[in-house]
């Protein structure tokens, strides 16, 4: 679900934290991608002309495999080095949110049955999107596909967003990539949004600089996490009637969520807000501040050459994809992975203070310097 209204608050109060990129601008960058979010997007977006999901001859959904295969190839062809992070076991505190989502899916399934006779395609699609979730089997299939493609992945101990942020913070990757704004609660160096859908929707990729965001909001990490909980997160409900503008104002006035709760409880005559009974906001904060993760320096990230025969066996013989297209995609991937070792230009140079002019290097010197390997 993410954090309600956070994106707009950052744009308003910390505009310098935002940068917009095209895919080509991220050439040479290593990125940790929230795999669960990707699978959800592909299950919704990758459809046949009649609006139905792609399926094999046996009727098994294959939209997630199509999206993961072709989108990953596109990322690698653009010079990125993607790795994926899958969700592990969800925190106990998230159970309430997951139960709400289940009820919404059940309600949507009922609406779909009612609309099958009289509803339009658009109406059916609206409710069908609410029923989408990646199953355990689909997650396992995506992992198998990535392994055959030579693309690294790991399974997080718990939340994938927290693990992506840790990898970015540890320098294993440049940024965490997810649509969930609560990734920022886990302190990534950078967050990339719309990375896996930007080209299809003709929209830019948003980069949020974590430190610039805190500076613009004039908050430390603890206060920022308090703000996110007050806005509404996956771990607990929020205070009814408190929207983004009010949440920001309350945090600025009182300094912390503890102080806000205390003020509301001690001054019921001065405010219309009521703190939810047994509100586990402090437990939610601890999950953000001290998430269950694998330390970045314990994670080995390596890209390998794709297993073409394995891809044909899995994607063509088992899942019914076109052999010509799978082989073509595998060759593109192989070529792009070999070409990706060039690195970024900013990995070759260090910015230094200006000094007295020196002679220009001749062509031979320039050629020699051009062969210097990037650090990363």
From Swiss-Prot:
Residues 1-105 are annotated as: N-domain. Its EC number is 3.1.-.-. GO terms for cellular component: mitochondrion; nucleolus; nucleoplasm. DNA binds at residues 47, 71, 159, 232, 234. HAMAP family: Fen. InterPro entries: 5-3_exonuclease_C_sf, Flap_endonuc, HhH2, PIN-like_dom_sf, XPG-I_dom, XPG/Rad2, XPG_CS, XPG_DNA_repair_N. Binds 2 magnesium ions per subunit. They probably participate in the reaction catalyzed by the enzyme. May bind an additional third magnesium ion after substrate binding. It is found in: Nucleus, Nucleolus; Nucleus, Nucleoplasm; Mitochondrion. Its cofactor is Mg(2+). Mg(2+) 2 binds at residues 180, 182, 234. Residues 123-254 are annotated as: I-domain. Residues 341-349 are annotated as: Interaction with PCNA. It is an enzyme of class 3 (hydrolase). Residues 356-376 are annotated as: Disordered. Keywords: DNA damage, DNA repair, DNA replication, Endonuclease, Exonuclease, Hydrolase, Magnesium, Metal-binding, Mitochondrion, Nuclease, Nucleus, Phosphoprotein. Mg(2+) 1 binds at residues 34, 87, 159, 161. The gene is FEN1. The lineage of its organism: Eukaryota, Fungi, Dikarya, Ascomycota, Saccharomycotina. GO terms for biological process: base-excision repair; DNA replication, removal of RNA primer. Structure-specific nuclease with 5'-flap endonuclease and 5'-3' exonuclease activities involved in DNA replication and repair. During DNA replication, cleaves the 5'-overhanging flap structure that is generated by displacement synthesis when DNA polymerase encounters the 5'-end of a downstream Okazaki fragment. It enters the flap from the 5'-end and then tracks to cleave the flap base, leaving a nick for ligation. Also involved in the long patch base excision repair (LP-BER) pathway, by cleaving within the apurinic/apyrimidinic (AP) site-terminated flap. CDD domains: H3TH_FEN1-Euk, PIN_FEN1. This is Flap endonuclease 1. Belongs to the XPG/RAD2 endonuclease family. FEN1 subfamily. Interacts with PCNA. Three molecules of FEN1 bind to one PCNA trimer with each molecule binding to one PCNA monomer. PCNA stimulates the nuclease activity without altering cleavage specificity. Gene3D superfamilies: 5' to 3' exonuclease, C-terminal subdomain, 5'-nuclease. GO terms for molecular function: 5'-3' exonuclease activity; 5'-flap endonuclease activity; DNA binding; magnesium ion binding. Residues 359-368 have a biased composition (Basic and acidic residues). It holds the Pfam family XPG_N.
